[in-house]
């Protein structure tokens, strides 16, 4: 049997990725989030599949079908709560995974990093179209506001929006196609994840010290397989606790009201995990400018490897850039808070300042800090 896993064409691939994979001996708990994301994706696909068996993508029955799932389907309430809150845990893991990459310089594996950014965009797109499906007030108005942003595209904007809507407003055609996209995208994400892993295994994992670890590698199984298992238990405990004790904690009360095109909710806002990007979008008074800022708030991650100036890889021994990293974390929390607030004084100016700081840290201060630390090393 020991030989079969090393020789069988299919088992060999699994063996090289999950059993005999050489891994640095000093990788910390921050390296757990990759496998946790895999677990999140599997959970979402599985719960989503069971929800799709009972859901109807028609504006006259969508809201009722979700009610039916929660009331009449065996454990439907649990499946829906796990799916809805699983999305929140998915994004918590994504943001932690990206933060780890930024802190320890994992972005220097450029192919792996860029596929990761594409994965983030795909996941955000999937979550957005999924949020529209229950056809509540916030689903409908969220879809209207976000799809309307495409009208800012010069010359073809108007036609583009109507093409995506499948008509002159968000209607039945929109809901049907969003359901089709929401069903399809997770499998695209799974395929892109395979590519992400393929490129990662070309180089091997980075480690907290940021130095070559070829001299000190250990096998993935049993060491990190059990370490990942501990992460699985912790995350599933958190997810089930949230789904069972406070399933609506992170949702919007407006979504318990069926969609009504004639009544606009007082505050239109996305789910909590998009609030930071929504705050950046709202901080610019110009429509096209806001859309570009929204886009670049994510795409800025792609320029991080290009702007890396330091001679050291991670931030473990770089206090100046460490300060910038934690300033960025604080800034994102402020943006998340502002995204959920009404557009009025003082929230407008706070959002604008936080947005400027967000881009300044990425594009100006981090490269400068790396350069300054190199100079300090020369003087030492």
UniProtKB/Swiss-Prot annotation:
Q: Does the keyword Cell wall biogenesis/degradation apply?
A: no
Q: Which Pfam families match?
A: Cytochrom_B_C, Cytochrome_B
Superkingdom to which the source organism belongs: Eukaryota
How this chain sits in the membrane, per its record, is: Multi-pass membrane protein
UniProt-recorded Gene Ontology molecular function terms: metal ion binding; ubiquinol-cytochrome-c reductase activity
Keyword annotations = Electron transport, Heme, Iron, Membrane, Metal-binding, Mitochondrion, Mitochondrion inner membrane, Respiratory chain, Transmembrane, Transmembrane helix, Transport, Ubiquinone
So which cofactors does this thing need?
A: heme b
Classification via InterPro entries = Cyt_b/b6_C, Cyt_b/b6_C_sf, Cyt_b/b6_N, Cytb/b6-like_sf, Cytochrome_b, Cytochrome_b_C_euk/bac, Cytochrome_b_N_euk/bac, Di-haem_cyt_TM
Binding sites annotated in the UniProt record for heme b b562: 83, 182
Q: How is the cofactor bound?
A: Binds 2 heme b groups non-covalently.
Which residues are involved in binding heme b b566? 97, 196
Q: What does this protein do?
A: Component of the ubiquinol-cytochrome c reductase complex (complex III or cytochrome b-c1 complex) that is part of the mitochondrial respiratory chain. The b-c1 complex mediates electron transfer from ubiquinol to cytochrome c. Contributes to the generation of a proton gradient across the mitochondrial membrane that is then used for ATP synthesis.
Quaternary structure and interacting proteins, as annotated: The cytochrome bc1 complex contains 3 respiratory subunits (MT-CYB, CYC1 and UQCRFS1), 2 core proteins (UQCRC1 and UQCRC2) and probably 6 low-molecular weight proteins.
Q: Output this protein's name.
A: Cytochrome b
């Amino acid at each position: 049997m020991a030989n079969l896993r090393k020789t069988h064409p299919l088992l060999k691939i699994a063996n090289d990725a999950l059993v005999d994979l050489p891994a640095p001996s000093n990788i910390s708990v921050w390296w757990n989030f990759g496998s946790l994301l895999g677990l999140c994706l599997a959970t979402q696909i599985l719960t989503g599949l069971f929800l799709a068996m009972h859901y109807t993508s028609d504006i006259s029955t969508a809201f009722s079908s979700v009610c039916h799932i929660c009331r009449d389907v065996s454990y439907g309430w649990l499946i829906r709560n796990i799916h809805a809150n699983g999305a929140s845990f998915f994004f918590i893991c994504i943001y932690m995974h990206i933060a780890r990459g930024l802190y320890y310089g994992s972005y220097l594996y450029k192919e792996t990093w860029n596929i990761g950014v594409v994965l983030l965009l795909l996941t955000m797109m999937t979550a957005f179209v999924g949020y529209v499906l229950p056809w509540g007030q916030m689903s409908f108005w969220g879809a209207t506001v976000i799809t309307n942003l495409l009208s800012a595209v010069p010359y073809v904007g108007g036609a583009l929006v109507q093409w995506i809507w499948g008509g002159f407003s968000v209607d039945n055609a929109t809901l049907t196609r969003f359901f089709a996209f929401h069903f399809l995208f997770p499998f695209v994400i799974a395929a892109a994840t395979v590519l992400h892993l393929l490129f990662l295994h070309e180089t091997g994992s980075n480690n907290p010290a940021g130095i070559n670890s070829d001299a000190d590698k250990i096998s993935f199984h049993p060491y990190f397989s059990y370490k990942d298992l501990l992460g699985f238990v912790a995350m599933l405990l958190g997810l089930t606790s949230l789904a069972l004790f406070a399933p609506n904690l992170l949702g919007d009360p407006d979504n318990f009201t069926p969609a009504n095109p004639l009544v606009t909710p007082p505050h239109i806002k996305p789910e909590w995990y998009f609030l930071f990007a929504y705050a950046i979008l709202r901080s610019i008074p110009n429509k096209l400018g806001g859309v570009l800022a929204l886009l670049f708030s994510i795409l800025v991650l792609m320029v991080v490897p290009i702007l890396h100036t330091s001679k050291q890889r991670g931030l473990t021994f770089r206090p100046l850039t460490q300060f910038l990293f934690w300033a960025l974390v604080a800034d994102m929390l402020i943006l998340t808070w502002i995204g959920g607030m009404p557009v009025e004084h003082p929230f407008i100016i706070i959002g604008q300042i936080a947005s400027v700081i967000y881009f300044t840290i990425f594009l100006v201060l981090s490269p400068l800090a790396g350069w300054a630390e190199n100079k300090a090393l020369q003087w030492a």
